[in-house]
């Protein structure tokens, strides 16, 4: 029997189980500049129907914040009260040493590639600190938008 050992890969012998494993080896240090209060300043993004790949830390965090805008009833002040925002902010601040995330709200938010209504941030598990950190800071993780 031939055996193949892959580091950092979870594998089962079941053909009906599929896993996605992201190695922590791709984590980069933060590229965010902190404001005078030690906060990361982020604005909403425009994530349309065009086919595009977003790889920068700023774009990936902006995507999460833009998702929260839609989950919060289209109100910036309500985002700060969302449990999901607290989870994302805690993970990002722990990783970067920032004191918080400040949403600028200068740009009009847009997510136009998703055909399902928003009920949750399904792109990552915000309960899992490592998932948040890997999504934002791992150079091997990108966000691809497209239209179905």
Language model segments and positions:
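Intrinsically disordered, low-complexity segments enriched in Ser/Pro/Gly/Ala and basic residues
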Residues: 13-15, 28, 54-55, 71
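Low-complexity intrinsically disordered segments
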Residues: 48-142
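A structural detector for beta-sheet-dominated domains
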Residues: 22-23, 35, 43-45, 104, ...
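Prokaryotic Sec-type signal peptides and long signal-anchor helices
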Residues: 14, 36, 139-141
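Short, extreme N-terminal segment that most often corresponds to the first beta-strand
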Residues: 2-26, 147-148
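Short non-domain terminal segments
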Residues: 8, 30, 42-45, 83, ...
């Amino acid at each position: 029997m031939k055996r193949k050992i892959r580091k950092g890969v979870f594998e089962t012998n079941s053909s009906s189980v599929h896993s996605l494993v992201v190695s922590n080896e791709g984590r980069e240090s933060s590229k965010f500049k902190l404001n005078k209060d030690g906060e990361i300043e982020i604005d909403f993004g425009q994530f349309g129907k065009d086919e595009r790949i977003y790889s920068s830390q700023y774009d990936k965090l902006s995507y999460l914040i833009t998702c929260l805008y839609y989950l919060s009833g289209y109100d910036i002040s309500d985002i700060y009260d969302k449990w999901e925002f607290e989870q994302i902010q805690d993970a990002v601040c722990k990783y970067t040493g920032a004191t918080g995330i400040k949403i600028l709200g200068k740009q009009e938010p847009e997510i136009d590639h998703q055909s399902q209504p928003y009920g949750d941030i399904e792109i990552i598990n915000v309960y899992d600190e490592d998932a948040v950190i890997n999504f934002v800071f791992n150079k091997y993780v990108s966000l691809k938008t497209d239209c179905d």
